[in-house]
Amino acid sequence: MTGNLSGENPAESVSTTLAARPEDIALDVAHTAVVVIDMQNAYASPGGYVDLAGFDIAGAAGVIGRIATVLESARTAGMQVVFLQNGWDPDYVEAGGPQSPNWHKSNALKTMRARPELEGKLLARGGWDYALVDGLKPQPGDIQVHKPRYSAFFHSQLDSVLRARGIRNLVFVGIATNVCVESTLRDGFHLEYFCVLLEDATHHLGPEFVQAATVYNVEKFFGWVSTVEDFCASMRAIAKP
């Protein structure tokens, strides 16, 4: 199963089969993108927002390396890579005020209110916290999209950027599995994208069971679940010389 090929000649397409749950899925490389969710200092580096807010980021380092492996395989095969970065303008207008539920629920905003010395430092565009981690820097041909909320499809250019390139299949990696990754994947499903979660290339925020809950939700209701090893194997089968 794969996305709409938009009238393109099937003979010109390059397809591979990805081992996944609940069943394998066929991915046409030209119509598939790896979507990297929020691999920013805020979420994966000591001293970033998530660390300062009291969440355990110990698992993030391993995820960075596995995502780098995924991206190398994807680029070698000619697959599109899209980086998402979560945050707001330096004045936090995009974050919303007290009339927005985001003002009340964002742990970054709550942390800054509790610790005034951090004001203006967390998830502000142009700052260290907002920047992508050193181990995952965009390469020529990669796409970067800003997002102001958990779902990368909300008030962003993501949907139009993907549709303009004929992308119908999305392979998700990043942080946090149970928040921004799942929110974006669910919205992708509702927008008729075929969504795959690479479960060992994601990291959750909170207790271990929330990772398992997201994996269950994706496998049963919203898409397909695979692994870094299986993804890279499928890319090697079609890698450009």
UniProtKB/Swiss-Prot annotation:
Keywords: Hydrolase. It catalyses: (Z)-3-ureidoacrylate + H2O + H(+) = (Z)-3-aminoacrylate + NH4(+) + CO2; (Z)-3-ureidoacrylate + H2O = (Z)-3-aminoacrylate + carbamate + H(+); (Z)-2-methylureidoacrylate + H2O + H(+) = (Z)-2-methylaminoacrylate + NH4(+) + CO2. This is Ureidoacrylate amidohydrolase RutB. One of its GO terms (molecular function) is hydrolase activity, acting on carbon-nitrogen (but not peptide) bonds, in linear amides. It is an enzyme of class 3 (hydrolase). GO terms for biological process: nitrogen utilization; uracil catabolic process. It comes from Haliangium ochraceum (strain DSM 14365 / JCM 11303 / SMP-2). Its EC number is 3.5.1.110. The keyword Cell membrane does not apply. SUPFAM superfamilies: Isochorismatase-like hydrolases. Hydrolyzes ureidoacrylate to form aminoacrylate and carbamate. The carbamate hydrolyzes spontaneously, thereby releasing one of the nitrogen atoms of the pyrimidine ring as ammonia and one of its carbon atoms as CO2. Belongs to the isochorismatase family. RutB subfamily. It holds the Pfam family Isochorismatase. It comes from the Bacteria. HAMAP family: RutB (MF_00830). The active site is at D38, K147, C180.
